[in-house]
Regions:
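Extended, highly charged segments
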Residues: 1-228
Length: 228
């Protein structure tokens, strides 16, 4: 038998399937099943590669956003991160982080003496959120876009502080030239660090969202305590 005609259960039509005359019907069926499984597995591998590529694109999108507001020390930490992840070849020289006890994050202070810790790259974001911040501090970050983590060192927020912190997060983000930028905020204790991921990522628990028009004038309302 060279072929067999069967019902197509997806659209109700008839379809003709070629057969290999060297084999019986059962063997032909098994051969087609094996081809199906191979194709299915290939699609699974392809989807995994697509997902990995999307992750890489998102990662470099974050890096491109953060480098716009980076100073020399921020940029050197970003270079070190790329070396550690294998994107750049490591050079035989002492890195900035080996000379410092912690990353070079920024500390700002409001008129009410409330401190903001601002990460200017992925390494700093990880540090201020998961090491520097207390569980009762508040975390701010733009929604669904790359940007700085802003930690408010306080367990009690008023409207002024919320808008100020959200303004800093919006300004140091990919949405800095947009309007009505959504900024999520929550207490640090609700955050989790996803396992096996690159630095700078968090998993959100319960959170609130505020909409802010980014403006560099927000920085004029804050005192720069020290560059760390």
């Amino acid at each position: 038998m060279k072929e067999v005609t069967v019902d197509n259960y997806y659209d109700g039509t008839k379809m003709t399937i070629p057969l290999d005359e060297r084999y019986d019907g059962k063997t032909n069926a098994n051969r087609y099943y094996n081809k199906y499984q191979k194709a299915k597995n290939s699609l699974k591998v392809l989807q995994e590669q697509i997902d990995l590529t999307k992750e890489e694109i998102n990662y470099f999108d974050r890096m491109m956003t953060l480098i716009e507001n980076a100073d020399y020390y921020d940029a050197m930490e970003m270079k070190e991160e790329l070396e550690n992840l294998g994107y750049l070849k490591k050079k035989m020289s002492k890195s900035i982080r080996k000379k410092k006890k912690h990353p070079h994050y920024q500390t700002l202070k409001t008129k009410d003496d409330v401190l903001f810790y601002v990460g200017k790259n992925n390494i700093q974001n990880d540090y201020v959120t998961f090491k520097k911040a207390k569980k009762t501090d508040y975390w701010f970050h733009v929604k669904d876009m790359p940007g700085s983590h802003v930690i408010v060192h306080s367990d009690n927020l008023d409207e002024y502080t919320i808008r100020l912190a959200a303004g800093v997060a919006a300004y140091y983000s990919k949405g800095k030239d947009s309007s009505s930028v959504p900024v999520n905020y929550t207490q640090v204790k609700t955050l989790k660090k996803p396992g096996g991921n690159k630095p700078g990522l968090v998993l959100l628990g319960h959170y609130k969202t505020i909409y802010i028009d980014p403006d560099s004038s927000v920085l004029k309302e804050l005192e720069k305590v020290e560059e760390r």
